[in-house]
Amino acid sequence: MIRLIITGSLAIAACSQTLETPPAAVAPGSANILRVVFKPKPDRPIVAVQWELAVPGELQIAAADVVTGTAAESAAKSLNCSARNDPKTGKLCVCILAGGVKVLPEGAIAIVKFAAPADAKPGTVTVRLRKIQGVSTELKSVPIADVEAAITIR
């Protein structure tokens, strides 16, 4: 019975939509980008996505620093983000990617520009995408698992 439950969980995870955020690095006093990459499943097309981006205080980011990626642009989507300070995470950006009825293809749906202050200490910090929700072509909510990215300050 336990084996069936574990296998079922793996099957559900294998069939779900995912976002990926490859690791990135930045030197103190400079900027870099983080790509948010969408990995779709053809059996459940997505037309819109919303998420929260939790950025630690060691990095600097503004809502205007989050722009559409090439996959989102090819589907004629627009991206709107709102940022606020968060005592737990540092900065919190809430983003909605939507517009029209075209399905999101695989690829970068958002590009996040971030910077490390000149006095940033070397180390690794974690950026989190959480509370991710997709919207299907039938306008049904499609939960997407949270994801983290490691940012190395050199």
Model-derived features: positions:
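Sec-dependent signal peptide recognition
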Residues: 1-8
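Acidic, low-complexity intrinsically disordered segments
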Residues: 15-154
